[in-house]
UniProtKB/Swiss-Prot annotation:
Its EC number is 1.2.4.2. This is 2-oxoglutarate dehydrogenase E1 component. The keyword Chaperone does not apply. Keywords: Glycolysis, Oxidoreductase, Thiamine pyrophosphate. Homodimer. Part of the 2-oxoglutarate dehydrogenase (OGDH) complex composed of E1 (2-oxoglutarate dehydrogenase), E2 (dihydrolipoamide succinyltransferase) and E3 (dihydrolipoamide dehydrogenase); the complex contains multiple copies of the three enzymatic components (E1, E2 and E3). One of its GO terms (molecular function) is thiamine pyrophosphate binding. Disulfide bonds: none annotated. NCBIfam families: 2oxo_dh_E1, PRK09404.1, PRK12270.1. GO terms for cellular component: cytosol; oxoglutarate dehydrogenase complex. E1 component of the 2-oxoglutarate dehydrogenase (OGDH) complex which catalyzes the decarboxylation of 2-oxoglutarate, the first step in the conversion of 2-oxoglutarate to succinyl-CoA and CO(2). It comes from the Bacteria.
Length: 927
């Protein structure tokens, strides 16, 4: 044996892997290895001592013990060790050998490259007939059979990467599932698979013939992805899943809408004929066909599952966090704490998956408690191109899925032309997600039959590839040939399937000519919500109720060690409420939340540091000073109250805002808020604002009551901590699509938050929220301003009792600058200062009436802190001047504020103070 050890290089050959794995096993559970190995490993101080000459004798002794146990095994103990090493190395590296490319363009590695030849493990061809027994194997093989089994399992049409999975139970389960080979298909199932392929390809070809050149972003070449999604849904249904939400980009979407989600073919075809996707009377912009979502119920026997496909823009992968948020909201509604009743399927393209940062943001947040949805089943449709860019131009790794390993996700790569392999991989992935509640990826390597779209010419840039594609059999044809060869179908079966489906589509086409598009919205939970406001929402709450709630919010458990500074703060709040004294911003916000919670409204607030608040004002989560326990006063108001969920988010804007927007889509009765650490950082999520929040209603008939809190205000903190880019939100504002506000009083924020739930419409609310004003002595409101029969006031008149006829100058402003103007004005009674608490929609009637009140004034000024090319000026100029005309005043508003600037603010506090003083003096006419 010792001689054999020297021959095979035991210590430094394939057995090294085996010994290292055995050592890991020993570290986890010493009793799980033989006593002799226990003695050896107990003498090892670190893994570097495992494989050196001084330990050889001890290893040989342990090996001899193993040999005595398996003396009847025809293969020596040394080789038995090497069998383990070979199996492990196949598991780790054989995916590089797998035949994944249906076009045959990829040059794969060889066994010699990967050191997977039998010679690398001390075997020779003479031993191929020798019988092998090993703990990894469920049955006995000879060496040749074992090699064939490993080749078929790990180097065939499926290549797997499971080694990054950190949990050993999960990893072993995955390998066992793959190696068991139990997933097979009956003749009837094979026929159903073929039928699916016929319908996928048939619909694409039908559209291609009827509407030549029309964009549809065909799935052809990646046909298996549609069949795989259907398989995943059917498997999930039998696992007790009640709902599946699907997110995807545009490629293959029309087939997903029809074949997977169940939208009638005639509805999709009608969109090609008329160009209309919604009823004309809705008067909305709509969107292209391959961006639209849909929902339906699929019934199989006595089981039913609800399916929904999320709407999305052309911004690839942007939908990822939105659909995840929607899934989480649905799980929360069902109290699905195990995350097993509502499931997520996400379809990616290869270039976008590794190219778009939101993918990494979404993946990294998926295991976190506030964003976990029990795992996502990811399908990466790798058609080996990104528009015209080759794979080598879009990533440095072989696989587009490489960086997904940051969350230790198992990955199965599969050849898209081998439909049964695709379905086997899907089966494993679906089971894994449901069993372990974690993400899993199936990458389908396929191709794109046409160019990026059907009007694009791919031969310009990928001539070699497309010459292969042109002469290639489709996945349906390939599978039909296999079934004919195996005797499952005869030569006519495939042709009949195609004829039957073509006849069905012809009927659908005729019905599509007179098809009236339907608007599937404002049903179910959304009943009672309307697109237009019918009345002003009364948002006030009885004063005694507010005092009672406020007092309750200031009470702490006796055994809970609150920070002494917070004890003082809460005592002061309680005293103010009890004495009916004015309250500050944080108190008003907490009262808004408390009054909604006790009325049955669930509230969810996330964002960086939002539990405490960036500016240490909210303190809605109290931390015990002795241990790590927490106490949330808002969840301790009454036994019947709704839930307040608050979570400090990971350091992301794009994905976190997207998640909360998605959460808000599921239930209009929830108040959902996202707070930026500083408003300046919100533009990291600009795509969410542009493509979803501002435009989803007119594009897709999707409403949202999401609240976005953006700390804003020029306070000398530099260009990155001053501006939430108010001007950008005002530029996006149109068609009554959202509220853009810059409130200045606690009463305003109280009413704004409550209006989001009490009103009969759901519009996103953008709030330029305060920073220094959170502790400003004048930023307070009386409880009466929050009391019964009160409401949000979009415009606030001059607070002092000035004689209107004596007013010579009227200053309109919004936000923090008001308090600076107010203080500098002092006792000057000839200047009236009016605040716009809501900039959009512009409350023209209210402004006109106030201007009429001050019609004796000779000067009308719009004052802002922001540079002239920022802030509200360029949006509001025409509104203000039109209001002057309606008020019968022949004048125009003059701008006073900072000059135009490429940067939002100066970097110096001294320079800021000079600028601020200058604009205030100019506005007030102070020398």
């Amino acid at each position: 044996m010792e001689e054999n050890l020297k021959k095979t290089g035991f210590l430094f050959g394939g057995n090294a892997v085996f010994i290292e794995e055995l050592y890991k096993q020993y570290l986890e559970n010493p009793a799980s290895v033989d006593q002799t190995w226990q003695e050896f490993f107990s003498s090892v101080k670190d893994s570097n001592q495992l494989l050196n000459k001084s330990t050889a004798k001890i290893i040989l002794k342990a090996a001899a013990t193993e040999e005595s146990k398996t003396s009847e095994n025809p293969v020596s103990t040394t080789n038995n060790f090497n069998v383990g090493a070979m199996i492990k190395n196949y598991r780790k590296y054989a995916h590089y050998l797998a035949k994944l490319d249906p076009l045959g363009l990829e040059v794969t590695k060889t066994k010699e490259d990967l050191k997977l030849s039998i010679e690398n493990f001390g075997f020779t061809n003479d031993q191929l007939s020798k019988v092998i027994e090993h703990k990894f194997l469920e049955k006995t093989y000879n060496l040749g059979e074992l090699v064939n089994f490993l080749d078929k399992t790990y180097a065939g049409s499926i290549g797997v990467e499971f080694e990054q999975v950190e949990n050993e139970e999960e990893k072993n389960w995955l390998y066992s599932k793959l190696e068991s080979g139990v997933i097979s298909f009956s003749s009837e199932e094979k026929k159903n698979i073929l039928n699916d392929l016929v319908e996928v390809e048939g619909f694409e070809q039908y559209l291609h013939t009827k509407f030549p050149g029309a964009k549809r972003f065909s799935v052809e070449g990646g046909d298996a992805s549609i069949v795989a999604m259907n398989k995943a849904i059917d498997l999930s249904l039998h696992q007790g899943v009640e709902e599946i939400v699907i997110g995807m980009a545009h490629r293959g979407r029309l087939n997903t809408l029809t074949k997977v989600v169940g939208k009638p073919y005639r509805a999709v075809i009608a969109g090609f004929i008329s160009g209309s996707v919604f009823p004309d009377e809705l008067n909305v912009s709509g969107d292209v066909k391959y961006h639209l979502g849909y929902s339906s119920d699929r019934v199989v026997g006595d089981k039913k599952i609800h399916l929904s496909l999320a709407d999305n823009p052309s911004h690839l992968e942007a939908v990822n966090p939105i659909f995840a948020g929607k899934v989480r909201a649905k799980q929360d509604m069902l109290k699905d704490n195990k995350r097993s009743k509502v499931k997520a399927i996400l379809v990616h393209g290869d270039a976008a998956f590794c190219g778009q940062g939101v993918v990494a943001e979404s993946l990294s947040m998926s295991p976190l408690a506030a964003y976990n949805i029990g795992g996502v089943l990811h399908f990466v449709i790798n058609n080996q191109l990104g528009f015209t860019a080759n794979a080598a131009d879009t990533r440095a790794s072989r696989y587009s899925t490489e960086f997904a390993k940051i969350i230790a996700v198992p990955i199965l790569h599969v050849n898209g032309d081998d439909i049964e392999a695709v379905l086997k991989a899907t089966n494993i992935a679906v089971e894994y997600r449901q069993k372990f509640g974690k993400d899993v990826i199936v990458e389908i390597i396929c191709y794109r039959k046409y160019g990026h779209n059907e009007g694009d010419e791919p031969m310009y840039t990928q001539g070699k590839m497309y010459n292969i594609i042109k002469s290639k059999l489709t996945p349906g044809n390939i599978y039909a040939n296999e079934l004919v060869k195996s005797g499952v179908i005869d030569n006519n079966y495939f042709a009949k399937l195609k004829e039957q489906f073509k006849a069905k589509l012809d009927k659908e086409y005729e019905q599509a000519k007179n098809y009236k598009q339907e608007a599937h919205f404002l049903g179910g939970l959304w009943q009672g919500i309307t697109r237009t406001r019918t009345q002003v929402a009364v948002t006030g709450v009885d004063k005694k109720t507010l005092q009672s709630l406020g007092t309750k919010l200031c009470e702490m458990p006796k055994d809970f060690a609150v920070n002494p500074k917070l004890v003082k703060l809460f005592d002061a709040r309680k005293a103010a409420l009890t004495a009916d004294q004015p309250i500050d911003w944080a108190t008003a916000e907490q009262l808004a939340f408390a009054s909604l919670l006790t009325s049955g409204t669930n509230i969810r607030l996330t964002g960086q540091d939002c539990g405490r608040g960036t500016f240490s004002h909210r303190h809605s989560v109290l931390h015990n000073q002795v241990d790590d326990t927490t106490y949330i006063p808002l969840n301790n108001l009454s036994k019947e109250q709704a839930t307040y969920e608050v979570a400090d988010s990971n350091l992301s804007e794009y994905a976190v805002l997207g998640f909360e927007y998605g959460y808000s889509l599921a239930n209009p009765k929830n108040l959902v808020l996202w707070e930026a650490q500083f408003g300046d950082f919100a533009n990291g999520a600009q795509i969410i604002f542009d493509q979803f929040i501002s435009s989803s209603e007119t594009k897709w008939l999707r409403m949202s009551g999401l609240v976005v809190l953006l700390p804003h205000g020029f306070e000398g903190q530099g260009p990155e901590h001053s501006s939430a880019r108010l001007e950008r939100f005002l530029q996006l504002a149109a068609e009554d699509n959202m509220y853009v506000t810059y409130p200045t009083t606690p009463a305003s924020i109280f009413h704004l938050l409550r209006r989001q739930i009490i009103d009969n419409v759901r519009k996103p609310l953008i709030v330029m929220s305060p920073k220094s004003l959170l502790r400003h002595k004048n930023v307070v409101s009386k409880l009466d301003e929050l009391g019964s029969n009160t409401t949000f006031l979009p415009v606030l008149d001059e607070v002092n009792k000035l004689e209107a006829s004596n007013i010579t100058k009227v200053i309109l402003c919004s936000g923090k600058v008001y308090y600076d103007l107010f203080e500098m004005r002092g006792s000057n009674s000839s200047i009236a200062i009016i605040r716009l608490e809501q900039l959009y929609p512009f409350e023209k009637k209210v402004v006109v009436e106030l201007l009429k009140k001050y019609n004796k004034a000779s000067e009308f000024i719009w004052c802002q802190e922001e540079p002239m090319n920022m802030g509200a000026w360029r949006y509001i100029t025409s509104h203000l001047n039109n209001a002057l005309k309606e008020a019968g005043i022949n004048n125009e508003f003059k701008y006073i504020g900072r000059e135009e600037s490429a940067s939002p603010a100066v970097g110096s506090l001294q320079a800021h103070n000079k600028q601020q003083e200058k604009l205030l003096k100019e506005a007030l006419g102070v020398k």
